[in-house]
């Protein structure tokens, strides 16, 4: 999106330095980096700024910054979005056995009108740890025919799959999802079994 303005929030200045010095990111772009914690960024805010897309990519399967998973943080994001704005989260979990992702989804549903879950193909039918994308928005997007193909690690082209809303509600109930708040967010406990299965 060459005509867009992009704000990148990266807590580690060394990562920003590597992007410019080693990965060839030109300083002559519309990308502006803020070296600070993401929650502090949204608390301070930029006057008059509303985002069309916010991407959360801090959940790596090894650690869980709990303060970025709570209802209070989700509300900060919701307040920062444009009317058709979308919050995308990249999450690693075991769909069939994990409690981390269902609790994040359940918490998002307390703030956003629409929450959807996507994965490559139908990975939720397998018993394994996988990467998922959670989409939270107040706008009524039509995802019914969403089948954008993506290249798998094995080199196979597969469509993204979406778990239907009714099935998602059943999933949250079956997985005993909990509301994550600033006062109660046991994300490290939820992630521990994932770490054990990944043997990290």
Give each language-model segment a name.
Residues 103-107, 132:
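Alpha-helical scaffold elements adjacent to nucleotide-binding pockets in ATP/GTP-utilizing enzyme cores
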């Amino acid at each position: 999106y060459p005509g867009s303005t992009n704000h990148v929030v990266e807590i580690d200045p060394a990562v920003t330095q590597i992007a410019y010095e080693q990965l060839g990111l030109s300083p002559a772009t519309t990308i502006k980096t803020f070296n600070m914690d993401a929650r502090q960024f949204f608390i301070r805010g930029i006057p008059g700024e509303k985002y069309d897309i916010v991407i959360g990519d801090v959940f790596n399967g090894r650690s869980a910054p709990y303060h970025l998973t709570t209802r209070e943080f989700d509300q900060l994001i919701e307040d920062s979005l444009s009317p058709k704005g979308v919050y995308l989260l990249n999450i690693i979990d075991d769909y069939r056995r994990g409690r981390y992702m269902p609790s994040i989804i359940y918490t998002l549903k307390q703030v956003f009108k629409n929450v959807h879950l996507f994965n490559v193909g139908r990975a939720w039918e397998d018993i394994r740890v996988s990467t998922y994308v959670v989409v939270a928005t107040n706008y009524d997007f039509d995802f019914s025919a969403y089948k954008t193909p993506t290249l798998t690690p094995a080199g196979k082209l597969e469509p993204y799959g979406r778990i239907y809303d009714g099935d998602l509600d059943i999933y949250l109930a079956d997985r005993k999802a909990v509301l994550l708040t600033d006062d109660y967010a046991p994300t490290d406990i939820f992630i521990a079994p994932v770490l054990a299965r990944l043997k990290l």
